[in-house]
Amino acid sequence: MKKFILPAAAACLSAAIFALSGCAPQKSPSGVSLMGVQPADVGLVSECDYFVAAEPAATTRVNAAGLHFAGDIQQLYGSENGYPQAVVVAKNSLIVNNPHFLKSFLAEVEENEGWLKTASAETVISAVSSHLPEGTTPTFNAKNLTSEVISRCGIHLVYAADDRERVENFLKEMSDVDEQSVGKVKDEFFCEELGDIVNPPADISVYAPDGAPALALAKLMHEENTFGQTSVSYNVVPSSNIQAYVTGEDPAADICILPLNAASKLLGDGSTYRMLGTVTNGNLYLLSKDGASVTSENIREELNGKTIGVIQLNNVPGLTLKIILEKYDIDYEVIG
């Protein structure tokens, strides 16, 4: 299948510039045109017929911009168990020196899935917002964080020992549509067994991007669970900054949640961090302005000749959409 990247007209460098300057990108006459957009611009870029966004931010934009849910990316992808979107990793030093703590930590992450079904929206929001940088607010609020929205966030812990094949398959699929988007993962990347060593308490730092990944730790943050350590600090940060906490000479994060493709590129050799498991399993949705419905039966008819604005076009959201378009033999071009 042919895939093209078209230059934007003149000095149009982003979806925001297109919207503000009136300088329209070159649209594909056939197939699908893909345009990267910022989360806050979902629903606002006039050139786009559809948008791809992740829950819970998708519901926020539906309510704010008068959009409609048009399609479930997970269903279009075609896997009953979704796909490994975000993974949790831990420093090798922590895995070696205090695996007992990690066992307890992961057990609570498992419990979190059930807790989210019964906790009030206010409790969940308070848990997350209290761990954001001062002066910032979470990507969701009490009006859009319903039990239905949480159910669409794909939050479910799958241990690395049970998820290796699915992870490797999805990495290959992402590489097939953009070989620069992922890194090669070695056997050492997967932490498939934890020991029982218990060492003296330590200070542990945990980082997660705002959105569904942060919800995967909401119970732990609500309870300020330290698991008998000196301290466990939970930090929710903008998704665009998450890689900074696992890179450098002395990375800040002892435990971190980050997108699978980023984890493979930054940590795939297993030399500093190893993957403990997958925590979100697909939470992407196709949104429309006109109430159209996109299914596996009509996807080619509905999307042909249309422009789709995609958050994080070069990461899991955009890569997953490209995988789906290839699956249904739909040509696409990246514009803007």
List where the protein language model places each region.
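Short boundary motifs at domain starts and secondary-structure transition points
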Residues: 78, 195-200, 299-301
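Solvent-exposed, acidic/flexible segments
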Residues: 51, 78-83, 95-102, 106, ...
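Pocket-lining segment of extracytoplasmic ligand-binding domains
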Residues: 38-130, 260-262, 291-292, 336
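N-terminal hydrophobic or amphipathic helices and topogenic motifs
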Residues: 2-29, 144-236
